[in-house]
């Protein structure tokens, strides 16, 4: 079996609890009234990060995002990203330098619970998230506490993140980060390897040049061995 081994930087991941704000109104005056009271709590704790869930709004034009981000910021609440089930919101997020989280929709399906074999350590059952649509530049998809399966093409500048494994059954030109919470047994499986960056449990490799022919645009798996990323062709001996 031909194996391509890369040395990589060690990145120490850190955990940051991020709350989600489900927005129910676009009225800045109503929000201001609430934030004057609620904001005092967060101002005492310093700046608190949030993801803004805008699922109740169909179009980005429904909201004055610049004013919203500024309003929350003045009250000690830092908006890091937007969450919506429609990909049209990705461009709006990029415009204001925010992350975009694709929430569950008809193109995002939970495949249910997969039983974990070893339950003695109290591990939770792992969920799998399936993405059937292309993941475009600037979009980020995160499978929390589970695996991620993508059947659409992943564009350069798109980012896939999973706490478990990542499976990509299409050309992969973006970034894939498996084992995001430190699972060193996580793996990445790619049908057509053209990624710009891959990472397992914080150990990553940035690809500035194409891989050798037996790996470039070929099915590969990526895993950790002795704290090094190993990229091997699937089906090779």
From Swiss-Prot:
Similarity comment: family membership: Belongs to the MinC family.
Keywords for the protein's UniProt record, in alphabetical order: Cell cycle, Cell division, Septation
Intrachain disulfide bonds: none
Assembly and oligomerization: Interacts with MinD and FtsZ.
InterPro entries associated with the record: CAP/MinC_C (IPR016098), MinC (IPR013033), MinC_C_sf (IPR036145), MinC_N (IPR007874), Septum_form_inhib_MinC_C (IPR005526)
PANTHER family xref list: SEPTUM SITE-DETERMINING PROTEIN MINC
Source species, domain of life: Bacteria
Protein known as: Probable septum site-determining protein MinC
NCBIfam families: minC
Lineage: Bacteria, Pseudomonadati, Pseudomonadota, Betaproteobacteria, Neisseriales
Organism name: Neisseria meningitidis serogroup C / serotype 2a (strain ATCC 700532 / DSM 15464 / FAM18)
Function: Cell division inhibitor that blocks the formation of polar Z ring septums. Rapidly oscillates between the poles of the cell to destabilize FtsZ filaments that have formed before they mature into polar Z rings. Prevents FtsZ polymerization.
One GO term of the biological process aspect: division septum assembly
Pfam family, one: MinC_C
């Amino acid at each position: 079996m031909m194996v391509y081994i890369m040395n990589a930087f060690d990145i120490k991941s850190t955990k940051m609890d991020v709350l989600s704000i489900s927005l129910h109104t676009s009225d800045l005056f109503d929000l201001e009234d609430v934030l004057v009271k609620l904001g005092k709590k967060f101002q005492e704790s310093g700046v608190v990060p949030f993801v803004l869930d805008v699922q109740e709004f169909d179009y980005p034009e429904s909201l004055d995002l610049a004013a919203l981000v500024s309003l929350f910021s003045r009250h000690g609440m830092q908006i890091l990203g937007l969450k919506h089930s429609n990909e049209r919101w990705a461009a709006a997020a990029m415009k204001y330098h925010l992350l975009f989280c694709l929430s569950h929709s008809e193109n995002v399906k939970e495949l249910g619970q997969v039983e974990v074999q070893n339950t003695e350590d109290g591990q939770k059952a792992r969920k799998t998230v399936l993405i059937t649509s292309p993941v475009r530049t600037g979009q980020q998809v995160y499978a929390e506490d589970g695996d991620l399966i993508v059947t659409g093409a992943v564009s350069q500048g798109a980012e896939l993140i999973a706490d478990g494994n990542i499976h990509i059954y299409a050309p992969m030109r973006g970034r894939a980060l498996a084992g995001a919470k430190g699972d060193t047994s996580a793996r990445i499986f790619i049908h057509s390897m053209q990624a710009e960056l891959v990472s397992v449990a914080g150990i990553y490799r940035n690809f500035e040049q194409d891989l050798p022919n037996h790996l470039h645009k070929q099915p590969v798996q990526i895993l950790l061995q002795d704290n090094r990323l190993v990229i091997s062709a699937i089906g090779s001996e």
